[in-house]
């Protein structure tokens, strides 16, 4: 008897539904989100015919969490079904638009019963690959938070403190530079900045890590900070300075988190057997390699061919054909993280590989815009990576 299991998950409980190959309900139960609840789930599966040789597949609307991790540890196929797809499947069983947690569990079970071949199970990645995925994604999130904090701070400084922006306008990174943040922390208002001496500025630059040209840089900063600019009233300026310090603390925290998580991700990535192969590809370093491995994983059976990998990454186009109309367009539904690192990878490959540069130039010659040519190069690089890995 072929049985499928669906789980509608929540924070403190989960609804379980099991159906056989003919669609008959084998079992329904609500379990708690704890050890006892998971033990009950395993017992329900066993009673329905589950075995190590023929495990019952499970469908659930998430790929994360302790329940999913424990289910994957049992060695059974676990399918993460998009909630939007589940909502559309629900209409197959009732046109009244009724909904319940127990009913959703049965809908998930029926999805595996009827359309299992149309969905892919979660990959059987190694423990190290899963750890790299956690760290690489967390580091990317920290980078986004840093960018958000930086944009907020810069926008605020434009409102009341143009001197600090002008002082570092020609420096790479601008207000993100350690010395810029050090000066802002010491003088959060134009009035305080105008009072800084060259000795104080030299001390701030040294503390921020600058090693060369400290004296002339301190003199330059003092000249810029003491220039003539439009000003707010003193009380308003002080209030804006307090707000800037709060945003600066957020920026410093996000920057530290991004740096520390990057170091952790690289350290774990360097231990992976595929690290040497991945970094041998043109344009990939340890951090970008960790991001690629995090999204591709190390389950060799995950992608049937290079085309499926390219579609997953958003590098392969989508064709919409109906009657005499045929349109080829950029793929929107994709792994956004892998697609994002793809542009970084392709851009770096332009200087690391003459072949990559030649391919990019050919695409530009045929009329592709910069991003389209990069995406096409990313497509080629993904095919190359699958061959080597």
Segments predicted by a language model, with ranges:
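A detector of single, family-specific signature residues
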Residues: 1-387
